[in-house]
Amino acid sequence: MQRILIVEDEQKTGRYLQQGLVEEGYQADLFNNGRDGLGAASKGQYDLIILDVMLPFLDGWQIISALRESGHEEPVLFLTAKDNVRDKVKGLELGADDYLIKPFDFTELVARVRTLLRRARSQAATVCTIADMTVDMVRRTVIRSGKKIHLTGKEYVLLELLLQRTGEVLPRSLISSLVWNMNFDSDTNVIDVAVRRLRSKIDDDFEPKLIHTVRGAGYVLEIREE
């Protein structure tokens, strides 16, 4: 089930959106202020974000700026009463994918949501995002918290393997076979050294940590709750 985040401070509008999207078959979470909305969005667990501009604590402009600067590429639909052209242009230039004016027709909103989700799915095969890290499989680029990370060829292949099997514990023998095309030798620490070097680049200076050791089993890439 696809997950949609709604950040809307008007309670009636927020509940209406949430209920309507749930009835359309989506999982919809609602937050009524910018601070909590950004916190939820930063976890990278949503397929689409519906965002108001005028919000308590942090406004919509600040939220989308923070998300895009940290590498988040989830589609964002602004839903707002700010209807002048200058505001529309500002939203799109900050990285929004669509902009819908209040009052709105719910059927039009759903159509726009479906279009954005289809577009995102077509890009998903080449771009993977977990937490604040984005990996472009075509360009072979890695960005975490807005910072470009330089990897060697083998480090990139190792990261791509872990990404493609997020949440799955990969034994050293499998990593050895798929990344180095060789049988695993228990007397060598090649795999451990490679993982340690990869961790130093994508985990040491960032939170949350993404690569974890499962003692006696192998390695896994996942977001773990504190």
Swiss-Prot record:
A GO CC term assigned to this protein in UniProt: protein-DNA complex
SMART domains: REC, Trans_reg_C
Origin superkingdom: Bacteria
Primary localisation category: cytoplasm
Reported modifications of this chain: Phosphorylated by PcoS.
GO biological process, one term: regulation of DNA-templated transcription
Keyword Disulfide bond: no
Miscellaneous comment as given in the Swiss-Prot or TrEMBL entry: Transcriptional regulation studies were performed in E.coli K12.
Protein name as it appears in the record: Transcriptional regulatory protein PcoR
Organism, scientific name: Escherichia coli
